[in-house]
Amino acid sequence: MRIDFHASPEPTLGVEWEFALVDRRTRDLRNDATHLFARAKPRLPDPDKLHKELLRNTVEVVSGVCHTVGEAMADLRRTLEVVVPAGDDLDLDLYGGGTHPFASWTVQQLSEGHRYEELINRTQWWGRQMLIWGVHVHVGMPERDRVMAVLSSLLNFHPHLQALSASSPIWSGIDTGYASNRALMFQQLPTAGLPFQFERWSEFEAFVGDELVTGVIEELSEVRWDVRPAPRIGTLENRICDGVPDLADLSSLVALMHCLVVDLDTRAAAGETLPTMPPWHVQENKWRAARYGLDAIVITDAESNERLVTEDLADHLERLAPVADRLGCSEELAQVAQIPVRGASYQRQRAVAERTGGDLVAVVDSVVRELRAGLG
């Protein structure tokens, strides 16, 4: 099967930021996306920057095609400055965690759409439990034949991104012991989770052809890998990160993803064979980061060397500094180092729960406040 990749001549950025809708008083989920759209979209200069998702308790705020992290953040901010007040009119808040700490999946309502209906019809119990939210970052790729090499090498940084963004420690009222319960929930869907590490684009084309012929998917977008090509728009899409509560953490993570992809693609274009790890190391790293977050000891190379994820991260931030300078995101990349200092979202949520004697409403409050504080 032929899949055309509409290459992007520049390493442009696009960001998709998912939010849960929570009630102002109870802090439980509200299936009110339709009402929020009705309030917010007429006020938006570009209504297409606010999307529906699988469940009616979810909205997605998206940027346009941007050239810098700062431009993408400003674009998202402009949309949120309309959507958040529209939520105020409905006694709704936007919640940026990877999971909700106490909501029940049994009362959530499905959004209208054939694709969503088919997903639930096929996946049943697991699909209905997808009370999860994340951030997706697209980076433009100039050459189709480098996409799979960059994708495979980017998986070396899966645990770093997972640990930094982890924001889903509590599920159904219980602390799971995981920094990112979302990561392990989402991979229960049959086409989600870690990607296959193909060497050539033709292998990816053959895979998609097999999936279509056997009825596993109806369209390419149903391949829901943690990192995947987006051929129609010429990007590599990074879907590793949990939901992010505020603009500060988001700008740092987007800068890191932008720099990583551009660095790897530049090296591949220069003829370098990019470093990769065997799938069993990649799989183990994902589990370790989901379980231990910033305390994870991760495998760093194909020779099975290991290191604390934050120590390894510090070296990569230093190495990527010249890339960030070229991309105009030096300040945002430098702020990545502050996430472990401040505490990742999963750590901040646990601290609130401990301080309040396990009050999960207070946990939701704290996540909501972070978004509002960042908007000013």
From Swiss-Prot:
Record flagged with keyword Nucleotide-binding: yes
Protein origin, superkingdom: Bacteria
Reaction equations catalysed: L-cysteine + L-glutamate + ATP = gamma-L-glutamyl-L-cysteine + ADP + phosphate + H(+)
Family annotation (Pfam families): GCS2
GO biological process: modified amino acid biosynthetic process
InterPro entries, A to Z: GCL_type2/YbdK_subfam, GCS2, Gln_synth/guanido_kin_cat_dom, YbdK
Enzyme class: ligase
A molecular function GO annotation: glutamate-cysteine ligase activity
EC numbers, comma separated: 6.3.2.2
Alphabetically ordered keywords of this record: ATP-binding, Ligase, Nucleotide-binding
Claim: Ligase is one of the keywords in the record: yes
Similarity section: Belongs to the glutamate--cysteine ligase type 2 family. YbdK subfamily.
PANTHER family the record matches: GLUTAMATE--CYSTEINE LIGASE 2-RELATED
Function noted in UniProt: ATP-dependent carboxylate-amine ligase which exhibits weak glutamate--cysteine ligase activity.
Protein's recorded name: Putative glutamate--cysteine ligase 2-3
